[in-house]
Amino acid sequence: MNYEDVITGQGIEKKFKNFELNIPELHIPKGFSTALIGENGAGKTTLLNILAGIRRDSKGDIRYFEQKQNIEDALVKERIGFTGTKNFFMGYWNGDQVKEMMSMLFDSFDADKFDGICRSLNIDSTIFGKRGKSVSKLSDGNRMKLMLATVFARNTDILILDEPASPLDPLMRDMLGDMIRAYLAEGDGLRSVVFSTHNVSDMENVTDYIIIIDDGRILEEGFVTDLKEKYILVKGEREDLAAAEQHLITCQSNSFGFEGVALTDNMNKFAGMDVEFDTPNLFNISVAVMKQNSKLTMPVL
């Protein structure tokens, strides 16, 4: 697939005491929704914070909009919206103060649009008005909805969203998917979204491109359609498990049969076995790739 990059990175590094993010090359495709997937502590938040300019103590060269531009440049900041896992509102602010601060910080912030989004998302109305309660009183889900309202109320070209679905209920996760699709559609190929998620199944319908990270490094990346051709889901009977398992990246089995993920190029190795092939979903692919490098082991229960 031919595409342009909206963000590119070279030699991105950030060292901590017991962890190192090391991304030799990074490509975020323009006009698409990119999901960053990985275990807890894999480096997703660190990478997104670097891209959003929250962390400025990393090494490497990052280019936005096909040019080398400083994330501190006001024109670049104006074109990027960011939500993080930590509440970036002052705890004592109420809804009106949030709106006032966003209006001061970003020229494209539309206060009326913000009000409309807050109503549509059913955000607790008691935070608004002269005696509105502080945003610290909101539930985790409502705080995330409020953060989303601030970025969707701006005219941006990139949204960087760190775990936006995590605190949301199933209905709001579905709504978030609709909002991302609408945002991309309104940009007519010029807008892009980058988000991290553990809710792979819930967010699959809005994911075009994935980057799977483990221990600070990229394990796999590509358009979802391409990866669904690269990998194949294999299902078979119990009697073929021993022969099939050696060709599977991951495998789950019970007394009736097995299911696992393999490389499509290895389909011929299942010849003579009573197996069925199917298209894997994004969850199947992500877990298969992550399990190859994971330190997790099944405990004795």
Language model features by range: what are they?
Residues 1-25, 30-32, 73:
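A short, flexible loop at the N-terminus of ABC-type nucleotide-binding domains that lies
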Residues 37-39:
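The feature captures the beta-strand-to-loop junction immediately N-terminal to the Walker
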Residues 60-71, 75-76:
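Conserved ABC transporter NBD signature motif
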Residues 84-146:
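ABC-family P-loop ATPase nucleotide-binding domains
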Residues 159-163:
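Catalytic Walker B motif of ABC-type/P-loop ATPase nucleotide-binding domains
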Residues 249-301:
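C-terminal coupling/interaction segments
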